[in-house]
């Protein structure tokens, strides 16, 4: 059977181990070819190929439900659930999503993008099943670092107190999340993974028993059971901790041995109550380059399969915002031992790995534990340290109560640096950084700022480090800067709450925030081609907003447009409208941003075009709204 013929996972039933191994080979081949061509998550999926095939062969997927954590480890799942022929569209507009979506496929039982959600969701399904008197299996596959998240541990705590609720948790233990796992839980799991002596004993047990006089051949049929028993005996002390939590423990099992996996899953399915199957896997399995560099090949841009190297850009690009941030923070930290960089398992993505390498004592990785990261930072601030929480905008949502309760109510000087703010592209709605302006703006005792370019980011970083009158947050986008000239050091802080005028005009006031300032200037240039002169403001701060600058100009000019890369509801444009009303300036305002919709996976350029955020689209919209007679004469295209 060829992988392309599998449209339903139940087609795996009855296949021999050798046939499954061939399917596994084809999955890895398709997986590698696709990611090499279009980019995406590489290592996680390669590590769970055998796990997926073995698990699905022991389930009836017409009834049973499997909930995958995070989602980027579920590419093999996608390939055996009817998406083989469309898999080449992975992470592309209108193509297969990079994560799990209930709307995409009947076998995607729960959407996943953020970590540590699977056990809670699967337990909820199991409880609903029992309440309705139905019978089917509920399985949560968690791993790639997600077990370090507090939510997963809360779910384990709950499930362990439900001895009559059948729930299977499959732990994909590859010793990694995106970066190497940290913390006591990771150390514990490493102890549970088979040690070399135990592995040697079980691997050689069968050969030794064959040489026993009279008994060798007769014991051979029981050998696998005996080997399993010896493994369980070897890990009984550490595995007992899981059983103390109320789970029946199976493992650890070799995550790339199909026979062992199938046998273990069958045994675990017979158990009553919550069970945990501990599967030891290798991230990037089957692609030697990814196995050697598991951090670097967690996700990849399009690359050459033969060398593993990313294809070079067609033209030189400016450094990314993340890279500029990392360099500036490390430079500042070298001269200020109170600066501490904090990441929640995203050292490489945020650039904090540079700080880790240079100043390891001023670096903390808490694992996938955003709530803990924020309150840890609050504690550091209490003792006079300067904590810098570098985190993706979408992940800070997970620590909202801690921002309010532990930081802002106590007016503690914690500096939040929000990477991937705005449209992020192919990762889709679970990772778009749309909401931070709105959800942070309403909290007292926090300052919000966003740089117009990478050079201004350097100055804002100094501003945030020096600000001590409460919390402060800086948002910045994914990807390259605009090519603004950078200084190596000597950056000057910005005055809090003050914007700047970048261009003067008489017909309309254009106010940009953050990465949209560059587009705002482009809009002004397009409007000028039609005889419309615009004043352009770089707001810099949304809280406090520079009302002293904005209100008089809005009153004088009489027409206003705002530009942001985030949700309109409660966002920057809303802040401007509120400020104008507070100053009794009643003028028409046109807001540009993301409406009350989710932004699906596509390139950033495609997403901006889909939401009317290209400079040409915005200029045309302004002309239609404020200068209708002029707009009717000509049109502008890009």
From Swiss-Prot:
The gene is dxs. Its EC number is 2.2.1.7. It comes from Picosynechococcus sp. (strain ATCC 27264 / PCC 7002 / PR-6) (Agmenellum quadruplicatum). Catalyzes the acyloin condensation reaction between C atoms 2 and 3 of pyruvate and glyceraldehyde 3-phosphate to yield 1-deoxy-D-xylulose-5-phosphate (DXP). Pathway: Metabolic intermediate biosynthesis; 1-deoxy-D-xylulose 5-phosphate biosynthesis; 1-deoxy-D-xylulose 5-phosphate from D-glyceraldehyde 3-phosphate and pyruvate: step 1/1. SMART domains: Transket_pyr (SM00861). This is 1-deoxy-D-xylulose-5-phosphate synthase. Belongs to the transketolase family. DXPS subfamily. HAMAP family: DXP_synth. Binds 1 Mg(2+) ion per subunit. GO terms for cellular component: cytosol. Homodimer. GO terms for biological process: 1-deoxy-D-xylulose 5-phosphate biosynthetic process; isopentenyl diphosphate biosynthetic process, methylerythritol 4-phosphate pathway; terpenoid biosynthetic process; thiamine biosynthetic process. Signal peptide: none annotated.
């Amino acid at each position: 059977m060829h992988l392309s013929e599998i449209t339903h996972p139940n087609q795996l039933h009855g296949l021999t181990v050798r046939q499954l191994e061939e399917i596994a080979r084809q999955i890895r081949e398709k997986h590698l070819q696709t990611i090499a061509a279009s980019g995406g998550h590489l290592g996680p999926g390669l590590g769970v190929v055998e796990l997926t095939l073995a698990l699905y062969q022991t389930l009836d997927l017409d009834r049973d439900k499997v909930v995958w954590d995070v989602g980027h480890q579920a590419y093999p799942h996608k390939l055996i659930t009817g998406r083989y022929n469309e898999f080449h569209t992975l992470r592309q507009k209108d193509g297969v999503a990079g994560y799990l979506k209930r709307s995409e496929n009947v076998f995607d039982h729960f959407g996943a993008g953020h970590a540590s959600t699977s056990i809670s969701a699967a337990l909820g399904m199991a409880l609903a099943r029992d309440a309705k008197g139905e019978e089917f299996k509920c399985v949560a596959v968690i791993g790639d670092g997600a077990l370090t998240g507090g939510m997963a541990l809360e779910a384990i705590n709950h499930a362990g107190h439900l001895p009559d609720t059948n729930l299977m948790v499959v732990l994909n233990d590859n010793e990694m999340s995106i970066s190497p796992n940290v913390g006591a839980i990771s150390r514990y799991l490493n102890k549970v993974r088979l040690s070399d002596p135990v592995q040697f004993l079980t691997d050689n047990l069968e050969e030794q028993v064959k040489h026993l006089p009279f008994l060798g051949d007769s014991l051979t049929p029981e050998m696998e059971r005996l080997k399993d028993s010896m493994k369980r005996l070897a890990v009984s002390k550490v595995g007992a901790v899981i059983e103390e939590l109320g789970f029946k423990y199976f493992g650890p099992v070799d995550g790339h041995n199909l026979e062992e996996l199938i046998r273990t899953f069958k045994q675990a399915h017979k158990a009553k109550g919550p069970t945990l199957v501990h599967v030891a896997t290798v991230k990037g399995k089957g692609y030697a380059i990814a196995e050697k560099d598991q951090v670097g090949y967690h996700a990849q841009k399009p690359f050459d399969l033969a060398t593993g190297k990313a294809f070079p850009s067609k033209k030189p690009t400016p450094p990314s915002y993340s890279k500029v941030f990392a360099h500036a923070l490390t430079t500042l930290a070298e001269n200020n031992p109170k600066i501490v960089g904090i990441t929640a398992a995203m050292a490489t993505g945020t650039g904090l790995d540079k700080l880790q390498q240079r100043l390891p004592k001023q670096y903390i990785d808490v694992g996938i534990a955003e709530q803990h990261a924020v309150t840890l930072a609050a504690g550091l601030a209490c003792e006079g340290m300067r904590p810098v929480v570098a985190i993706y905008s979408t992940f800070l949502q997970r620590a909202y109560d801690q921002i309010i309760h532990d930081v802002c109510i106590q007016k503690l000087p914690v500096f939040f640096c929000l990477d991937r703010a705005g449209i992020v592209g192919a990762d889709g709605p679970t990772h778009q950084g749309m909401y931070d302006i709105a959800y942070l703006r309403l909290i007292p005792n926090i300052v919000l700022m966003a740089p117009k370019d990478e050079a201004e980011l350097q100055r804002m970083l100094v501003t945030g480090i020096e600000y001590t009158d409460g919390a402060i947050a800086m948002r910045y986008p994914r990807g390259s800067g605009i090519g603004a000239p950078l200084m190596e050091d000597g950056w000057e802080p910005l005055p809090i709450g003050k914007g700047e005028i970048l261009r003067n005009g008489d017909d309309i006031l254009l106010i940009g925030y953050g990465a949209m300032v560059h587009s705002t200037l482009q809009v002004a240039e397009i409007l000028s081609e039609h005889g419309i002169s615009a004043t352009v403001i770089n707001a810099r701060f949304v809280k406090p907003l520079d009302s002293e600058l904005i209100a008089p100009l809005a009153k004088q000019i009489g027409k206003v447009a705002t530009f942001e890369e985030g949700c309109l509801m409660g966002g920057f444009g809303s802040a401007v409208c509120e400020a104008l009303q507070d100053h009794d300036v009643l003028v028409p305002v046109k807001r540009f941003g993301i409406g009350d919709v989710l932004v699906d996976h596509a390139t950033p350029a495609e997403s901006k075009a889909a939401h009317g955020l290209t400079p040409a689209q915005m200029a045309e919209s302004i002309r239609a709204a404020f200068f209708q007679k002029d707009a009717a004469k000509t049109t502008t295209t890009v």
